[in-house]
């Protein structure tokens, strides 16, 4: 369920940004991008398009270029560690890597799923493994500034979280 997945990605993103609090990180922008990061995912099942690219393009076309810029990087960042402090795109990218369907999982479990689903060809497998090295480095970067460990995310969210999400539309 893409809606449940996106809500979980949003909660993980908000938990991280709540504790990072670097100057310049826009919480509302992170919330919007996390909720919309898979906006064209369903369509991509039929078209085989890159849903990060098509989602970014759609959001640009309807007047949300900043959200689209982040959505376009939720699978693969344009630049890793582009600034001294984490960016909105890095937060959403990482949060997406921690959510498998609607469950928060360790990076290793998510990588295993992605390799199984998308890494059957040797070139794709190599690209995924390289991407995962960058994701592990991103995790270390983010959590160097956080008062909790990656394995604490599920527990912290279960205990309650300061982020607010709208109730899901039952029609979705």
Regions found by a protein language model. Name each.
Residues 2-15, 19-20:
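A positional/architectural concept
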Residues 17-121:
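Divalent metal-dependent catalytic cores for phosphoryl transfer on phosphate-bearing substrates
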Residues 6-7, 103, 111, 115, ...:
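Solvent-exposed, flexible loop/coil residues
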Residues 8, 12, 54, 90, ...:
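Charged catalytic carboxylate motif
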Residues 124-172:
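Charged phosphate-binding loop/patch that engages nucleotide di/tri-phosphates or the phosphate backbone
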Residues 5, 51, 67, 131-134, ...:
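General structural feature for long, well-ordered alpha-helical segments within catalytic domains
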């Amino acid at each position: 369920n893409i809606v449940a997945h996106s809500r979980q990605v949003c909660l993980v993103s908000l938990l991280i940004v709540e504790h990072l609090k670097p100057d310049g990180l826009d919480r509302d922008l992170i919330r919007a991008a996390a909720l919309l990061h898979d906006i064209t995912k369903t369509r991509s099942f039929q078209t085989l398009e890159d849903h990060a690219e098509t989602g970014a393009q759609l959001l640009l076309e309807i007047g949300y270029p900043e959200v689209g810029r982040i959505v376009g990087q939720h699978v693969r960042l344009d630049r890793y560690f582009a600034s001294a402090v984490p960016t909105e795109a890095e937060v959403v990218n990482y949060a997406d890597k921690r959510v498998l369907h609607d469950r928060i999982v360790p990076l290793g479990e998510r990588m295993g799923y992605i390799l199984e689903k998308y890494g059957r060809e040797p070139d794709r497998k190599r690209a995924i493994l390289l991407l995962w090295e960058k994701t592990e480095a991103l995790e270390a970067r983010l959590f160097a500034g956080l008062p909790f460990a990656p394995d604490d995310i599920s527990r912290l969210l279960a205990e309650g979280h300061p982020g607010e999400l709208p109730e899901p539309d039952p029609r979705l």
